[in-house]
Amino acid sequence: MNPSARRRARECVVQALYAWQVSQNDIAEVELSFLADQETQGADIAYFRHVLLGVASDVEALDTLMTPYLSRQFQELGQIEKAILRLAMFELNKRDDVPYKVTINEAIELGKTFGADDSHKFINGVLDKAAPIIRKRMQIRSQNGPYQSVC
């Protein structure tokens, strides 16, 4: 695993999620268009596809997962904040191979790169609260099997 390739993949995921959220086109169309039109050199394309399609297929659950940790209404979030938080929630909830501190740091950097002035601070606050709880639930799920409730 190349960390810079993962970072570039996350940047591409945020951009593709933004395009998907704004256009409301089919995620497969967005993916193909993005891969054809955007600069993806240096990105881990397999990771890009996995995360992009994973977020899109589980978006309602990811939004529900993040909502208790938001300091404002979900509808008030900007599209970039939504994209970054959805990506981070997916990694926290589905990718135990990615340390939660890496997920948080990467999301903060994405907020600095793509978000409004203080987006990275908001993202940091949400993920600092959410990460330990979500990862604990993930541990319980992996110990008990996928069909046991953790709530």
Curated annotation (Swiss-Prot):
Domain of life: Bacteria
CDD domains reported in the protein's UniProt record: Terminator_NusB
Coiled-coil blocks: none
A GO CC annotation given for this chain: cytosol
Molecular-function annotations in GO: RNA binding
Pfam families: NusB
Keyword tags: RNA-binding, Transcription, Transcription antitermination, Transcription regulation
GO biological process annotation, one example: transcription antitermination
NCBIfam families per record: nusB
Similarity comment: Belongs to the NusB family.
UniProt xrefs under PANTHER family: ANTITERMINATION NUSB DOMAIN-CONTAINING PROTEIN (PTHR11078:SF3), N UTILIZATION SUBSTANCE PROTEIN B-RELATED (PTHR11078)
Main function: Involved in transcription antitermination. Required for transcription of ribosomal RNA (rRNA) genes. Binds specifically to the boxA antiterminator sequence of the ribosomal RNA (rrn) operons.
Protein name per its UniProtKB record: Transcription antitermination protein NusB
Lineage: Bacteria, Pseudomonadati, Pseudomonadota, Gammaproteobacteria, Enterobacterales
Gene label: nusB
